[in-house]
């Protein structure tokens, strides 16, 4: 077990095996890394943009049965987050595509949406869903 002292973020050595060459990245490692990015921002807010990092389950829940904001509404409340999501400069949304991870970014600061895929894939469904979510 590895623990990040400042944030109470734990991860097992077994989960970290996915970082070896040729291994498949898992959701636990992605969620831990996103948590560490948020912790870094909290510790030094003057150095970083205000960001929100959704966990790896968010997009799947948002899109279950089509666009379904109700299924994630509680994840986005100011009470739950401790800050207003709409005041963030960037909102990061990890997306799992069967055996591949992509990242969508709602970049409010620059007023654009980004879809990042190391395999240069495209998903015409992602952007309309995120536009609907951003217009909440």
Question: Residue locations for each model-derived region?
Answer:
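Cysteine protease catalytic domains with a Cys-His-Asp triad
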Residues: 1-102, 106-112
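"Short basic amphipathic alpha-helical interaction patches in structured regions
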Residues: 107, 118-119, 130
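Catalytic Cys-His active-site segments of thiol-dependent hydrolases/isopeptidases
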Residues: 113-122
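E2/UBC-UEV (E2-variant) core
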Residues: 123-136
């Amino acid at each position: 077990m590895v623990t990040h002292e400042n944030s109470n973020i734990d991860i097992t050595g077994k989960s970290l095996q996915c970082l070896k060459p040729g291994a498949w990245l898992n959701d636990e490692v992605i969620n831990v890394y996103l948590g560490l990015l948020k912790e870094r921002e909290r510790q030094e807010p003057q150095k970083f943009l205000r960001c929100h990092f959704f966990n790896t389950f968010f997009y799947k829940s948002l899109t279950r049965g089509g666009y379904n904001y109700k299924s994630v509404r509680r994840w986005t409340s100011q009470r739950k987050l401790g800050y207003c999501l709409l005041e963030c400069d960037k909102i990061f949304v990890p997306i799992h595509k069967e055996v591949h991870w992509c990242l969508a970014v709602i970049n409010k600061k620059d007023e654009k949406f980004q879809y990042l895929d190391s395999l240069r894939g495209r998903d015409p469904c992602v952007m309309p869903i995120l536009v609907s979510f951003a217009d909440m």
